Amino acid sequence: MKQQTFSDFEYSNRKRKTKREGFLEIMDEIIPWDEWVGIIMPFYPSGKHGRPPKGIELMLRMYLLQIWFNLSDEGTEDAIYDSYAMRKFVGINFLEEDAPDATTLLKFRRLLEQHGLNKLFFDAINRVMVETGHMLKGGTVVDATIINAPPSTKNAEKQCDPEMHQTKKGNEWRFGMKCHIGVDAFSGLVHTIEVTPANVHDIQVTSKLIREDDEVVYGDSGYLGIGETGRDRIRHAPVRHRLSHQPPPEQLAEGIRQFG
């Protein structure tokens, strides 16, 4: 049982609980933490050399916050400091320790990716979200963002990492990778992530972001031409494309009511 803090006692007297806090409490109850920690444990640093690593469950909870709320590494760290609900979910008592920094989260995420655990957990999370009614399906918002990296970045073989590439966005040249995401239009939660070199065009990956039962896809002008080019053959049933549009206001309102 997590130790109660002064903030916990203070917040326990509130008249209402936020939807976000309620959602995180449900996730806290239904996720098999011991089982998931056991999956990661064989791959996690032992701490025999150097500074002792942060606890596996702590890092896993932080990683899940990043996925659910589509946060950057720095944004996740900041959110734990800013949000009582997120701090409570992670289980940090600021009288005893600080939140893990963005670099620590980055290393943890790379460890999961290295051993293929990120997809295992991501798929498991999506199943939990659908089963509990927090992800309704039917509509997806597609988007992409460039993850910058120094041009000198090398891989484990001391060679230029082939997964990183140079691309031009507007009048600016960027180097790194591109993160393509599919977001549930009803809840605002990320359901699919694909990572490519930065020079891969958005529409080349779109088919991987669309779920089998999606009926409508929303995207900005970068996705013009989707469904009309052989490079991106939509694998699923007929899908309506709403480019440069946001989901209907009633859907956005529902997402805000559930997770705002």
Predicted regions and their residues:
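Alpha-helical support elements that line or immediately flank enzyme active sites
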Residues: 58-70
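Polybasic low-complexity intrinsically disordered regions
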Residues: 2, 65, 74, 78-81, ...
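Secondary-structure capping and boundary motifs in well-ordered enzyme cores
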Residues: 32, 51-56, 97-100
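Charged, often Cys/His-bearing segments associated with DNA-binding zinc-finger transcription factors
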Residues: 1-34
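Short amphipathic alpha-helical "interface-anchor" segments enriched in bulky aromatics
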Residues: 36-37, 142, 146, 257-260
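Short, intrinsically disordered, charge-balanced linker/junction segments flanking boundaries
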Residues: 227-230, 251-260
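An N-terminal domain-cap segment
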Residues: 37-58
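Arg/Lys-rich, glycine/proline-spaced intrinsically disordered segments
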Residues: 50-51, 243-251
